[in-house]
Amino acid sequence: MNKGRVTQIMGPVVDVKFDGGKLPEIYNALTVKQSNENGTSINLTFEVALHLGDDTVRTVAMSSTDGLVRGTEVEDTGKAISVPVGDATLGRVFNVLGDAIDLDGEVPADVRRDPIHRQAPAFEELSTKVEILETGIKVVDLLAPYIKGGKIGLFGGAGVGKTVLIQELINNIAQEHGGISVFAGVGERTREGNDLYHEMSDSGVIKKTAMVFGQMNEPPGARQRVALTGLTMAEHFRDEQGQDVLLFIDNIFRFTQAGSEVSALLGRMPSAVGYQPTLATEMGQLQERITSTNKGSITSIQAVYVPADDYTDPAPATTFAHLDATTNLERRLTQMGIYPAVDPLASTSRALSPEIVGEEHYEVARQVQQTLQRYKELQDIIAILGMDELSEEDKLVVHRARRIQFFLSQNFHVAEQFTGQKGSYVPVKDTVRGFKEILEGKYDDLPEDAFRLVGGIEEVIENAKKMMA
């Protein structure tokens, strides 16, 4: 084994000198396992980041360097950080190094481990067909459909329903498609991760999910690499098992933020707004591995924090370049009791074109957006002058727009324990048919409230019958 000694410690960045001229490669994992004089054991992993010359490498620690001293012996493992992959990861919670951090014991030693650093799939391996991923959530499937193997950005503030939407997507894909999900908490609040784990355990979704966390309190090295740990687990399900995998990353901004911290500690010259000069490269290396191949697909849903609501900030701007669809959650809609609170006018998708979704779906989606846009324009007039001042045509637009707005809401399976109402999965063809019939005026005589928090249009008719009885 190639051994060296610690020569300098600067917080999470540690320099190690190797004698004999044999240096570990970039990205190799180095380990320290020893006890201190006071009896506390130090068990650390570093990742090689730079070769400095004079037989010295600069490394980034994956956990706190408290108690580490100069002269400590360090061992080169000869390979990159490797994490468990395969069915043994399902229902479990891991840290960046692939160590289990739940209460179900260690992962068996014979479980296969893969390195977290690898190349994106070769050009000829990529799948060229664009296929829609049916989520069973009406507003998503109709107005901003997700692409299998695509990347989706989920924008929203605190408490507007990002987590519930994520859970429902995990649930629907597990139930309807038998799919597997990987959740990577990057720079997450520990409390949120804990809540998510317990909520998923209660709803039974956890059995089809692997979870990886690098929380806010961890060093930047761990927060920067934890997304790659989750991605490596997802890649195994895609490449070795031919699965269509869902990869959730919350929050992709924290990945960039951790990279910025590491870059400064490594002594690189900062670029715009203090970010790392390698921002676009690091983001590209992560995002290009998330794709569809001839074997299977990884569809990634990423929560995106926008610093100070500035979309021109280099971090969100770099993320935008990789996204195929955006789902915007709006607080105003939660106040109206419309869940999921997806903004139908601000959410976008590359897949919403007649060639991909079909002519009928495209036409219905555009008419829905036009009706809602017109309603939005009329709201000022209604607020000042009231409904009576509108033309008959505009009154009809408002009448239908309100029904559409309520019909975009839906009961979720994962929210059954709160609402007491059964969740619903709506196939795309039923969604398109329902909205088409509303636009044609088929249900103009039904009360507005019949459209609230329902699945298909049949449920609306049932609700209306009960109300009118």
UniProtKB/Swiss-Prot annotation:
Gene3D superfamilies: 2.40.10.170, Bovine Mitochondrial F1-atpase, Atp Synthase Beta Chain, Chain D, domain 3 (1.10.1140.10), P-loop containing nucleotide triphosphate hydrolases (3.40.50.300)
A Pfam family per the record: ATP-synt_VA_C
Compartment list: Cell membrane
Topology in membrane: Peripheral membrane protein
Binding locations of ATP: G156, G157, A158, G159, V160, G161, K162, T163
One Gene Ontology cellular component: proton-transporting ATP synthase complex
Keywords noted in UniProt: ATP synthesis, ATP-binding, Cell membrane, CF(1), Hydrogen ion transport, Ion transport, Membrane, Nucleotide-binding, Translocase, Transport
Claim: ATP-binding is one of the keywords in the record: yes
Protein origin, superkingdom: Bacteria
Record keyword Ribonucleoprotein present: no
EC code(s) of this entry: 7.1.2.2
Chief location of this protein within or outside the cell: membrane
Reactions performed catalytically: ATP + H2O + 4 H(+)(in) = ADP + phosphate + 5 H(+)(out)
Assembly mode: F-type ATPases have 2 components, CF(1) - the catalytic core - and CF(0) - the membrane proton channel. CF(1) has five subunits: alpha(3), beta(3), gamma(1), delta(1), epsilon(1). CF(0) has three main subunits: a(1), b(2) and c(9-12). The alpha and beta chains form an alternating ring which encloses part of the gamma chain. CF(1) is attached to CF(0) by a central stalk formed by the gamma and epsilon chains, while a peripheral stalk is formed by the delta and b chains.
Protein name: ATP synthase subunit beta
Gene that specifies this protein: atpD
